[in-house]
Structure formats: structure tokens, C-alpha cells
Design a protein with these regions (language model features):
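Polar helix-capping/helix-linker motif
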Residues: 7-8, 21, 70, 98
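Low-complexity, acidic/polar, glycine-enriched regions of mature
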Residues: 27-202
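Bacterial N-terminal signal peptides that target proteins for export
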Residues: 2-14
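Bacterial N-terminal signal peptides
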Residues: 11-24
Length: 202
């Protein structure tokens, strides 16, 4: 067989292979991409005390990347600047930033990185993950209510409760009795900016 026919045959085979692979590559790249609207989102906390202490974090970032359109492939990443704590009281904020609590000089970030997503029912989703504060990492759970399914925009609002003493926060604030249980409230609003809709199982 002439050499040019062998070369043409090889080129044709490579072309066919490329044509067959390109659609799958394109599909693999099609995942939902969401952007969080910081202006309308909040991360808050409260702890029962002789007077309940409530506060927010003014500086934080959150992402929700997907590896497919299936909700359970999402990964929730939250990074909070601990020094941005805001209770409305300079004395309390200073105490919380100090070494007895957040210890922001040594460990400036509070983070949550999800490792598993479970749909509980049509409106409730649990994110199991690693929670880190003061350089101590432990497994915790964020339980969210999901709204706006199928609209391209929505909200996930959830809570996580942890024992502050598990993370080395054993002391209190002068003249204030503080409970051990701390509740974190995460309210994220965002929209899908590209990719297919998220697929929910329920």
C-alpha cells in the first residue's frame, strides 16, 4: 500500500478519535458555577451568657465549587477573618480576639471545608466537614435549608453548634457567665453564573 495512503489513514483515525473525545471533554467541563453575593449574605454567631452574646464576622469568603451537576459533589469552603468579629462592644471584641478565645495573632483564620454532602429531604441538606478555629480542627456539621431550587439564584441558610472548650476556649469574659455551646449561623445568597442547573435528588 502506498505510504501516502497509510499516512492519510492514520490522520483519519486520529481525526475520528479527536471528534469522539471532544464532546466528552466539553461535557466534563460543564458544571454549575456559583457566585456568593457578599452584600446580602452573613455569618453570625451567638452564645448564651448572663446576657446572650451575638456577633457577626465582617470579613469572610465562601465558595461552592462542583465537580458535576449533582448537589452531593459540591464542596463548601468558608474562610473567616477572625479579627473581623463584631459584637457591637469594643471590650467583648477585644476579648474574643485575644489568646483566650480566637487568638487571632497566632491563628487569624476560622475555616470550614466540607467533606460530605447529604440531602436529608426536599429542603434540608447537611454538609459534614472540617472546622478549624485557633489552629484546632475537628469534624462538625452544618445543616442548611435550601431555597430557590431551579431558579438560578437561591439561598442556603444553616446552623452549626460546637463546644468552645473542644477548641481550647476554656475561659470566660469578666463579669459574664458564658455557656460552652456556640451556635454559628451561615446565610449565603448567590446565583449560578454559568453551567447547568444543580440536580437535586429530592
Amino acid at each position: 500500500m502506498p505510504e501516502r495512503f497509510l499516512l492519510n489513514g492514520t490522520r483519519f483515525a486520529l481525526l475520528c478519535l479527536l471528534i469522539s473525545v471532544l464532546p466528552s471533554l466539553s461535557q466534563a467541563q460543564e458544571v454549575p458555577v456559583f457566585e456568593v453575593n457578599h452584600a446580602d449574605s452573613t455569618i453570625k454567631f451567638n452564645v448564651k451568657a448572663s446576657v446572650t452574646i451575638e456577633g457577626t464576622f465582617d470579613k469572610w469568603d465562601a465558595g461552592l465549587p462542583f465537580t458535576s451537576s449533582d448537589l452531593e459533589t459540591a464542596v463548601l469552603d468558608i474562610k473567616i477573618q477572625a479579627a473581623s468579629v463584631n459584637t457591637g462592644s469594643g471590650m467583648k471584641d477585644g476579648k474574643l480576639r485575644g489568646k483566650d478565645f480566637f487568638n487571632v495573632k497566632e491563628d487569624p483564620l476560622i475555616t470550614f471545608h466540607s467533606t460530605k454532602v447529604v440531602e436529608i429531604d426536599a429542603t434540608t441538606t447537611e454538609f459534614d466537614g472540617d472546622f478549624t478555629i485557633r489552629g484546632v480542627t475537628k469534624p462538625e456539621k452544618l445543616t442548611f435549608t435550601v431555597t430557590g431550587k431551579g431558579t438560578g439564584a437561591g439561598e442556603i441558610k444553616g446552623t452549626m453548634a460546637f463546644d468552645r472548650k473542644d477548641y481550647g476556649m476554656n475561659k470566660g469574659i469578666p463579669f459574664v457567665t458564658i455557656a460552652d455551646r456556640v451556635e454559628v449561623i451561615v446565610d449565603l445568597k448567590g446565583e449560578r453564573v454559568s453551567g447547568p442547573p444543580v440536580v437535586f435528588k429530592q
